[in-house]
Amino acid sequence: MRIALGIEYDGSGYFGWQRQAEVDSVQGQLERALSIVANEPIGLFCAGRTDAGVHATGQVVHFDTNAIRNEGAWTLGVNANLPDNIAVRWVKEVDDSFHARFSATARRYRYVIYNHSFRPGILRHGVSHYHGNIDADKMHQAAQVLLGEQDFTSFRAVQCQSKTPFRNVHCVNVTRQGMYVIVDIAANAFLHHMVRNIVGSLLEIGLGNQPLTWMGDLLALKDRNQAAATAKPHGLYLVDVTYPEQYQLPKLALGPLFMLD
């Protein structure tokens, strides 16, 4: 039996999604909880591996099991065995053709900037604080050059293991909600650190340090060293993963919960 789960988590206390020896990871905690409920070892596959400090409201995973449980038993049982900063949002049995990573047709991230003179207290791990005067409209305008299938070498991490730097960005929007600036971006897939590297460069434009045309210049240069520093991890959320309709996976509010949808 193959089971898909929708997961949300606060990534600030973990060394990323991927299971690693001797450090705490989201995957490790989920596999431990699932193995208790299934009464057998469980291995997980995810839609997107998030880095240390990065959060998710719409992560999707799947696993195979011999255990027979109803959806409520999986949800309640796993949540009861998880730490408070990880939660199962939904459970659905899927056919064997489904794969959390390879069946996905798009991923969507939101990067939340707290734009204020002083740092936040309550949301300090859920937003990235930048105190300069950020022009979100300029960031949005500059970001439109990223649309379509392009070579994103200038925005990939040096350690990125992808065989190709080409990705297809479906949409990118930058909006302001009071003190928050939100970068909302969807693509077929993302390179390692791609979203945070894009945000870092857009911030340079929003702060007035670079012209509107800079994003296009960076794309053409195909040189990571010419782009801005990688934006902080705390403001980044994996909010949605798109799959073919045949799987009929649940659709929930994207989040994060303190943002307007």
UniProtKB/Swiss-Prot annotation:
Keywords: Isomerase, tRNA processing. InterPro entries: PsdUridine_synth_cat_dom_sf (IPR020103), PsdUridine_synth_TruA (IPR001406), PsdUridine_synth_TruA_a/b_dom (IPR020097), PsdUridine_synth_TruA_C (IPR020095), TruA/RsuA/RluB/E/F_N (IPR020094). One of its GO terms (molecular function) is RNA binding. It holds the Pfam family PseudoU_synth_1. Its EC number is 5.4.99.12. It catalyses: uridine(38/39/40) in tRNA = pseudouridine(38/39/40) in tRNA. It is an enzyme of class 5 (isomerase). GO terms for biological process: tRNA pseudouridine synthesis. It comes from the Bacteria. CDD domains: PseudoU_synth_EcTruA. SUPFAM superfamilies: Pseudouridine synthase. The active site is at 51 (nucleophile). The keyword Isomerase applies. Substrate binds at residue 109. Formation of pseudouridine at positions 38, 39 and 40 in the anticodon stem and loop of transfer RNAs. Belongs to the tRNA pseudouridine synthase TruA family. Homodimer. NCBIfam families: hisT_truA. This is tRNA pseudouridine synthase A. It comes from Shewanella putrefaciens (strain CN-32 / ATCC BAA-453). The gene is truA.
